[in-house]
């Protein structure tokens, strides 16, 4: 990553990861006045949607898009969106080793776009991926103990939170020499 930052001072460093959002609220502990037990409605369905997200680790901006599935084709589509959002800048994309992050379609995209470089995190190390921390914050803020009666408003609230909240993960400071963080 240090090499990328030196070669492309104006380049974008993104950490990418998909996640699944279920309509069923996840329960967490909360404080409540004595005698007033919080009520969280449940839904008997397993309605869900996936989000692809990429965090700009320098500036804390997250780019998130909902999708119906996690496949290599959807990964390629999301990467094409990233290339359109940053039309002139080199992009270093940090991602995990999920099966849908590999494949001939992805290889072709990389061959056709020399501005895009991929670096894979070590296996079974989700804590290294800053996007995982974004998912955690979004779930805590929107998904846990929610009282949405319909799925569409939950999806909208989740996507709005992701795209409008600045995230300070401290990734660059932790993994890149400080002299390069100022570039």
Where would I find each of the regions flagged by the language model?
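Extended, low-complexity cationic-aromatic segments
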Residues: 1-80, 177-183
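Short, well-ordered coil/turn elements that cap or connect secondary structure elements
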Residues: 8, 88, 111-115
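C-terminal anion-handling pockets and recognition modules
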Residues: 10-13, 131-183
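Mobile genetic element proteins and their domesticated derivatives, centered on retroelements
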Residues: 17, 53-54, 60, 79, ...
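Acidic/histidine-rich, metal-coordinating catalytic segments
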Residues: 17-18, 89-102, 124, 129
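RNase H-like polynucleotidyl transferase catalytic core
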Residues: 37-45, 114-133, 147
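Short, aromatic/basic amphipathic alpha-helical patches
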Residues: 103-113
């Amino acid at each position: 990553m240090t090499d990328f930052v030196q070669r492309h001072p104006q380049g974008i460093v993104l950490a990418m990861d998909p996640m699944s959002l279920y309509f069923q609220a996840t329960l967490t502990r909360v404080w409540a006045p004595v005698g007033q037990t919080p009520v969280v409605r449940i839904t008997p369905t397993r309605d869900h949607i996936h989000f692809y997200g990429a965090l700009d680790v320098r500036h804390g901006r997250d780019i998130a898009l909902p999708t119906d599935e996690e496949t290599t084709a959807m990964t390629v589509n999301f990467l094409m969106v990233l290339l359109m959002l940053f039309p002139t800048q080199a992009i270093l994309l940090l991602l995990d080793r999920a099966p849908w992050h590999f494949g001939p379609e992805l290889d072709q995209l990389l061959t056709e776009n020399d501005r895009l470089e991929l670096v894979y995190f070590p296996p079974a190390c989700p804590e290294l991926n800053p996007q995982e921390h974004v998912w955690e914050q979004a779930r805590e803020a929107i998904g846990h103990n929610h009282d949405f009666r319909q799925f569409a408003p939950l999806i909208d609230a989740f996507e709005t939170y992701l795209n409008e909240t600045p995230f300070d993960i401290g990734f660059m400071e932790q993994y890149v020499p400080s002299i390069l963080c100022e570039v």
